[in-house]
Amino acid sequence: MKKRLVSILLVLVMVLGMFPTVAAAADAPTEITSAEEFATMPASGDYILKADIIITAPYGNNFSGTFDGDGHTVTLDITGTANYVGMFKNLTGAAGKTVTVKNVILAGKIDAASRGNVGGIAGFANPYSGPIKIENCKNTATIIAKEKVGGILGSCQSDAN
């Protein structure tokens, strides 16, 4: 009986040892540590920047997630050949979620001299489907554009409702 109990206990320990003892929280943001990770992050996730990065192109088309710069610097080195230029091309409101960009320090330069909708955080913000919040962001970058230009946003569409 004693051998059987020890055997069962040993099997139980071996089986439980196959499972990780520490699991990441399901709602923990994905860490971004490079420009490559920034450029390829899915548009609707939750992210936290864990290192200073240099970006040479805006992020995709429509960002609808949460981005926490965590006090890190994003150096912009962008020459715009199209409209909608910034760290993000567009921030697009999402139903049931507040799109948020916070705690970002911007440096560097955006040169889109013949273009419009150019801003440090985003070229354009459209809160039509849900709210957009930008908080505790600082821009020391030089931004050159033809029209609809701003230190944080190039332009913002008002809610149709």
What are the residue ranges of the model-derived segments?
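C-terminal segment of classical bacterial N-terminal signal peptides
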Residues: 16-24
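Surface-exposed repetitive/solenoidal architectures
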Residues: 24-161
